[in-house]
Amino acid sequence: ILSMLLIASPILFVLAVYPDSFSMSWNQGRGGFLFGLAFIVAEIIGIKFIVSRTRLIFGIPLAVATIIYFVLLDFGLHDYIINAAPAFNVQLIYSWEWFWDFLVITIFAISASILMFGKKWIRIVIAGPVFLAGSAIILSLDAFFPYDTLGPLQYFVPHLVQTNVWIINAFELGTATARDNLMFLQGDHGPFALQVFWPSAGVHSVVIYSLVMMAFLLKMNIKQNRKIMYFGLGIIGTIVINLIRIFSLSVFALKVSTNPVEFEEY
């Protein structure tokens, strides 16, 4: 329990001091911290591994140093990070800003896990750090390669768009056509164009899910065929959820409003 509290302490501190920063939007807040914490807690609870007092004591400075980082953000560090963005040709400031938070918490989670559990940390508490690291990687990609500039991830988007267009026309919700990642919608409130990029299409969630599921499945003592089946079903489920998200946005434009402000708020 003490090891779990130690690893969780920086996240709990940030949650207590900056609760408004925990937005569930993937690139506009620290909501991902909670998912990472949930994975860590789920993995540690129930294990029969005794962490020595010495390891716990050595872990305290790591937690304190991480907490200090988040405190310093209010004392000029945040502005320094934002001002440094142009020097690295960063396109999206929000993703750049949150990338550093996720990078720091990832380094802490991995370092603390190694310190607490030694070489066995990969078998004990891998999913949480993998989720946090995956989030940091995706945020960095979004910061440096925004919109459709990252070809491999953007490659899947037109297929999702075409599927969404087919569903709209099949259910006669309006008129929809597509060209690459651009949808042209004609509904009750007039025409509306919706351009979909890989982050908004949920490609990032598929990537992060894949990493986390691989971490979990490697630990599970089940047959290889079952692992492949669970992994595949999870990928399909994640894609379906992202399709539903794109579809709901399209229905809003078709049936509710084409006002850009209202659309953004939705």
Question: Where are the predicted features?
Answer:
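Hydrophobic N-terminal alpha-helices or hydrophobic patches in metabolic proteins across all domains
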Residues: I1-Y266
